[in-house]
Amino acid sequence: MFLWLFLILSALISSTNADSDISVEICNVCSCVSVENVLYVNCEKVSVYRPNQLKPPWSNFYHLNFQNNFLNILYPNTFLNFSHAVSLHLGNNKLQNIEGGAFLGLSALKQLHLNNNELKILRADTFLGIENLEYLQADYNLIKYIERGAFNKLHKLKVLILNDNLISFLPDNIFRFASLTHLDIRGNRIQKLPYIGVLEHIGRVVELQLEDNPWNCSCDLLPLKAWLENMPYNIYIGEAICETPSDLYGRLLKETNKQELCPMGTGSDFDVRILPPSQLENGYTTPNGHTTQTSLHRLVTKPPKTTNPSKISGIVAGKALSNRNLSQIVSYQTRVPPLTPCPAPCFCKTHPSDLGLSVNCQEKNIQSMSELIPKPLNAKKLHVNGNSIKDVDVSDFTDFEGLDLLHLGSNQITVIKGDVFHNLTNLRRLYLNGNQIERLYPEIFSGLHNLQYLYLEYNLIKEISAGTFDSMPNLQLLYLNNNLLKSLPVYIFSGAPLARLNLRNNKFMYLPVSGVLDQLQSLTQIDLEGNPWDCTCDLVALKLWVEKLSDGIVVKELKCETPVQFANIELKSLKNEILCPKLLNKPSAPFTSPAPAITFTTPLGPIRSPPGGPVPLSILILSILVVLILTVFVAFCLLVFVLRRNKKPTVKHEGLGNPDCGSMQLQLRKHDHKTNKKDGLSTEAFIPQTIEQMSKSHTCGLKESETGFMFSDPPGQKVVMRNVADKEKDLLHVDTRKRLSTIDELDELFPSRDSNVFIQNFLESKKEYNSIGVSGFEIRYPEKQPDKKSKKSLIGGNHSKIVVEQRKSEYFELKAKLQSSPDYLQVLEEQTALNKI
């Protein structure tokens, strides 16, 4: 087993070392397609984690696509080989860090896509080496901070997309050296945009996206309001909606006045101070060291009451334009928008980028969508908020297939029929806030496959049916705040990749984590404030879930309302044991990993969350291999044990432990012989010494202490079998003067022997015998080898007989031989020879 593990680890190490030196042609790993002499290299989902090991393609210009790979960190010189790349896609890589110099070598790069990653900061050295960059996309990340000078080297940058991040402010002069024409900062946490240091450097912008930020409509927002009012009509600027203070919540910034923004009068008149020469936008240094300016000093001025600043400059009042900026703005202002039909009570304007129509029917006392006559063609945005619309029919949006934004907020809508929006397949933003909707069900949102932003706040929603949001696979923002929700169905968010969720000011006493909150895998912001949280055991799971989230995801802290002793206390300040005393009786599991398993209690019982994610495939394969090897090893050991245990002699002999006797089978057979009855062989001679030989030859290797044993006879008689060695010792002590006699020897050994004892072939008695009978019992040895010599029978007795039986075919012949009278001298010689042995 250990050998297998060693071999596997060695193979992995060797393969790793080999990979570090291998350089592969990129078109052998990725797909390369040439379109109009431009090569497109697609390395999506090919498990690339070291692009510097790939050889660049043989092409003057090419586009690189490294989406959906394992590029968690970009190290210096990662793309050093790709000097002719004009675009680079790095989206969906879970990219967390970009080290300085990672893009060195990409001198020809024009477009960089970093969307859908986990970046938290853009450093000053992040974009070194890509000074020719014109397009930068970094949306749907976790960016909180942008360091000063992050874009200082990007003099040609025109498009910057930073929407749906966690940016709360923009540093001073962040866009000073860029040439931005498109800026998207939607879906962040920006509350204000100062003119000095930010807005003054984006005078050439033609599109600015400001939506979905918590704008603080106070005195700090006066510079932005003044700047927006002075922008020309053909420049698209997204709506900035006030979130604070509460009396201006939901109001458009452009609809507010200075008195509402700044009631105390402080800063009500927006002034632009004179900037020092170092901060002048267009200037250069002469050889004498003096600064020459191509634009006038910014004077501290106040726009006159009778003059419309927008007619003068196109930029905020007090800022004189350079010739370049002025010519650009004039070209936009002199462009005549196309003539398109516009509904009578509404105001329409054309979007400069795609010539789409923006229809503004806000607060026109419209009671039905059928009043919009004539219906606008090619409408991209439709604002009908602030009216008295009560019902919405299926036919109301039949001619609005190209809508990108639909605003139905602040009406009196109570019920929305099914399939109302089924033909709005291009809709990305839907506002239904400020109505009287009580229930949501799946049929309402059928057809909204591209919807990204859904606003349902300030309604009377009490119930949301299961699967309501499943038809919106691109939904990223959902506002359900200020409703009457008490619970959410299980898996309500499983079909929507929500990044921002607002559940503030509802009736939630607790929210289940399992099946509801744990489905929010792409969450970047959640607001749970203002709910009557019941700080008991049911809320422990929510508390643990909130604590695991990264900093800044939860907008505001959760406060308890019940029980009374915890009222107005922040949930995070209470320990789990205080919320749920039952946890004191349960031993807490030690934390052995950064993401331990968490046990909590819900109304359905204790639930245990999984410890951080799925097991890597390599570890899983290695574990299965180890288990397989251990199983084979254990099975082999069991097999060997069973075979060795079963390897035993086939026959055992009772009382005899020597394996030499393995071929001998003893059979005891009882004989009922009377003492006064003579056997049929009573006339035969008997030599008692053969009993000793038999005892020696059939002890089968017993120990010395076991060589002498007794056979008990039923009447109580005993036959003693002595060892030959003991017999020889006894013979040595016999008096030499004693006459050698067979009869005397027999009398000495068997004092009460029978006279009808005879012997024949004494020397052959050493050979094997068929059977041995002892005192009424018969010991048989089965005949297995036919080639053995004839066996002899030995019988001795006094009240018991020792019988050695032969086969029936030999019995009569042996009996005939034994009936002849024995030669005394022959017997004497054999006895003498035996004693010497």
Swiss-Prot record:
The answer to whether UniProt assigns keyword rRNA-binding to this entry is: no
Please report the residue spans annotated as repeat (LRR): 60-81, 84-105, 108-129, 132-153, 156-177, 179-200, 378-399, 402-423, 426-447, 450-471, 474-495, 497-518
Ranges for domain LRRCT: 213-264, 531-582
A Pfam family that this protein carries is LRR_8
Domain (LRRNT): residue spans on this chain: 333-375
Entry keyword annotation includes Zinc: no
Provide this UniProt record's keywords sorted from A to Z: Cell membrane, Glycoprotein, Leucine-rich repeat, Membrane, Repeat, Signal, Transmembrane, Transmembrane helix
**Quaternary structure annotation from Swiss-Prot or TrEMBL:** Interacts (via LRR 1 and 2 repeats) with PTPRD (via extracellular domain).
Where does the entry say this protein is expressed, by tissue?
Expressed in the cerebral cortex of the brain and at higher levels in some astrocytic brain tumors such as astrocytomas, glioblastomas and primitive neuroectodermal tumors.
Q: Which InterPro entries match?
A: Cys-rich_flank_reg_C, Leu-rich_rpt, Leu-rich_rpt_typical-subtyp, LRR_dom_sf
Q: Out of the domains of life, which is the source?
A: Eukaryota
Extracellular topological domain ranges are 19-618
Q: Which PROSITE patterns match?
A: LRR (PS51450)
Q: Where in the cell is it found?
A: Membrane; Cell membrane
Give the recorded effect for V206I. Answer: Found in a patient with schizophrenia; uncertain significance; decreased localization to cell membrane; decreased function in synaptogenesis
Q: Where are the transmembrane segments?
A: 619-639
* Residues annotated as glycosylated: N81, N325
SMART domains, alphabetized: LRR_SD22, LRR_TYP, LRRCT
Q: Which organism is it from?
A: Homo sapiens (Human)
Q: Which residues form a coiled coil?
A: none
Indicate the secretion signal residues: 1-18
- Cytoplasmic compartment spans: 640-837
Record's bilayer topology term: Single-pass type I membrane protein
What is the protein name for this chain?
SLIT and NTRK-like protein 4
- Family of the protein in this entry: Belongs to the SLITRK family.
Q: Which GO terms describe its biological process?
A: axonogenesis; behavioral fear response; cell population proliferation; long-term synaptic potentiation; memory; positive regulation of synapse assembly; regulation of synapse organization; smoothened signaling pathway
Q: Which SUPFAM superfamilies match?
A: L domain-like (SSF52058)
